[in-house]
Amino acid sequence: MKLTELLSDSYNAEEWRNKGYELPQFDIKAVRKNTFENPTWVHFGGGNIFRAFPAAILNDALNTGKYDRGVIVAETFDYEVIDKAYTPYGNLSLLVSLQSSGTIEKKVIASVTEALKADPQFADWKRLTDIFCKPSLQMISFTITEKGYSYNEDDLARGMTPVFALGKVTALLYERYKAGRLPLTVQSMDNCSHNGNKVQAGVFAYAERWAKDGLVPQEFVDYLKDESKITFPWSMIDKITPRPHEKVKALLAADGFEDNDYIETTRHTFTAPFVNAEETQYLVVEDHYTNGRPPLDLGGVLYTTRETVDKVETMKVTTCLNPLHTAMAIFGCLLGYDLISAEIADADIRALVQKIGYIEAMPVVVDPGVLNPYEFIGAFINKRLPNPFMPDTPQRIASDTSQKLSIRFGETIKKYIARGLDKHNLILIPLTLAGYARYLKGIDDVGKPFTPSPDPLLDELQSIVAPLEIGSKKQDFSCLKELYSRKDIFGLDLYEAGLGEQIEAFVKELYAGKGSVRSVLHRYTTTR
């Protein structure tokens, strides 16, 4: 069983279906012909998240029979991905959905019609410029990570031959401008807040510099800033696509599926002809398009307003996901866990995240309307965290904790104060913040040293708690004032907020001796 069999006229579809593979319900060749002649969507970034999510959503839309165009993928960074993960397999891939039950679902993704290397050194660049001149083109999108939107003075100074992704995209947009100032929507699908603004800032930076240097007319800049022509909508995306999993490879091999080799490029991109991803997914998009759009709502995309996208992001970051992750990271490191899926099976940890989410944070949740906050937390705790295929660790999540506490917990505390809510309802959030002072000590609950995760303030904050000793009966905890009054870390002075003394009391309990983290966590999660 090979993916390219599906491009022949005489493959054994029944064999695939009998082994649990969901096959495309559309004419692949017809979709490719339609897309070549009248393309509607180019996506930059051919990595695992693209194949597992945007491409899969379009595949589902095509399966309805209500749409007939695919997506053209363009790679701006690692061109070997095209040569090794797309071309040998006819641009087909296998999506393996990893269920929390430990089972998998398998679906062939056939929505990608072309895979191009987005750089002038390759012949594909001519094809890309032709596509950008097509009136039919509606949207370009990105999954290139937040770092992919970066640019610098050297690249701005290179003129019309930039190296960075957004410079190349701006050059292609200039081709579209010259073709008749054609409309287009520039859509980020990367997991970063206000992502449309990041794309917009980069594109404007290149265009304005080129205009200043006399390389393009000022009218090109005006075209990019005309929202009747070009828009940069926001989106919120949430789906985990880990590296190809050994267990998945073995399960596919047992089926007789031959395209199961791992691929590592010289730039250390890890991929495969298959992509494995968690079952849960969310993509909420600002509906601000200038030339129509592919009907991705047929595949589950939620189209809404910019304000609602922002509310979904706020719900996730301040209440329903990120704070729970950080609470697990702090206590997971202290209790010796190295896998999130194992940690959530701990009754005390499970109670911690459930009660932070449902009892303490939920009273001030931003309800976006398009997603139910209670259902979002439920899916996170019951499906996503326990998934045995997800290799996430508390140590990874604990990275840069000092930069995260303000958004993940400080915002909730601020809302309690602003709304005059009873701060006595806050027990496990203060306990988590107290746990941070215990975590900074770098000694786990059984007395074993561990290395705290990388953090720009780690040395500074560890020096604050340096006078504290675990198990010392008489010690001065006044150093905590220096920590918990830090507005740059917590978003507010926790003493002024009326929580400083409560947090100090928790810290004293957590420093009482070996086993105190477990006993304190158990006591407060069971009595909460």
Region locations from a protein language model:
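Substrate/ligand-engaging "lid" and interaction regions
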Residues: 1-44, 48-528
